[in-house]
Amino acid sequence: MGYTANGLINRPILASIHTEAFQHNLNRVRELAPESKIWSVIKARAYGHAFEAALKGLGSTDGFALLDIQDAVWLREHGWQGRILLLEGLFHENELELAQELACDLVVHCDAQVDWLETFKAKNHNKFNVFLKMNTGMNRLGFKPDAYRTAFHRLHSAGYQVHHMTHFANADQVGHEPSVGGQQELFNQTISGLPGSTSLANSAAILWHRNALGDWVRPGIMLYGASPTGLYADIAHSHLKAVMQLSSEIIDIQELKKGDRVGYGGRYEAQESMRIGIVACGYADGYPRQAKDGTPVWVNKGA
């Protein structure tokens, strides 16, 4: 990132965040899921894009979804009055009072969290909205289907408003197991007859599985203008706009002969005599050293 000293930028590299692209991508979610409400996922300080920019660009969302309760504190302190979902719930029982004060919705994914909420409800009259997470095949967080209904009834009996959530493992891939259809079928069978809204779809499901959206969608990567597949064609076809723009300057030029090599390990070999530009940007700036060759670069703003 560029920084200032005595009014000058010492290095020309700069990451620019375009909040209007945030709004464009959020509108795209609304076009694809017009009947669903939106949890905009901004975990890890909006994936490095800064909460300030996310709050400005995504301020028309129905709710923000994040990981750390201290990030929920930040949102409230900066004027966000809408809903906040803690995607992994609480990590410690002593966070319950703060979560209640902040009016957070909680994901519940394990027995310990159910225990905490039962104990808390016995001592307090206020209620949380709870999204009970089902493990339908991703095998990360959530109750297996055979334990899910028991957890639901415990929370429901304690007086909580309980909603239903799962997460797709392969919404961005065809022919991989578990499939979106298989996970969705298992989810629907398990919650049959239970009250509460549903939340299933991540970015990939919003883009390519619009029969699996649910009442609340949870876009993450697509809000930032990237595709879940990592393919530029999918970004273009989905009409997304990149929120972050990385720019720098060419600070030197090297003249190469055929056979000269460039970079660590000599990974690029000149096939003919050529000139190459050296850009002020490297992995110390956050650009991955393992990034593949061939990344498109615009010189002189694409002129």
Indicate residue ranges for each PLM-predicted region.
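Short conserved beta-strand and strand-loop elements enriched in small hydrophobics
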Residues: G294-N300
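Active-site loop/helix belt of alpha/beta enzymes
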Residues: N10, A44-G59, L102, V114-N129, ...
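Structural motif
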Residues: S36-W39, D62-G63, R83-L85, D105, ...
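Short, surface-exposed ligand-recognition loops at beta-strand->loop->(often short) alpha-helix junctions
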Residues: I17, D146-A147, D285-P288
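A charged N-terminal "starter" segment
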Residues: M1-D105, D111, E118-T119, K127
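Functionally critical, mid-to-C-terminal surface segments that flank or help form catalytic/ligand
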Residues: V243-D293
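Electropositive phosphate-/nucleotide-binding environments in soluble metabolic enzymes
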Residues: S16-Q23, G48, E52, L66-I69, ...
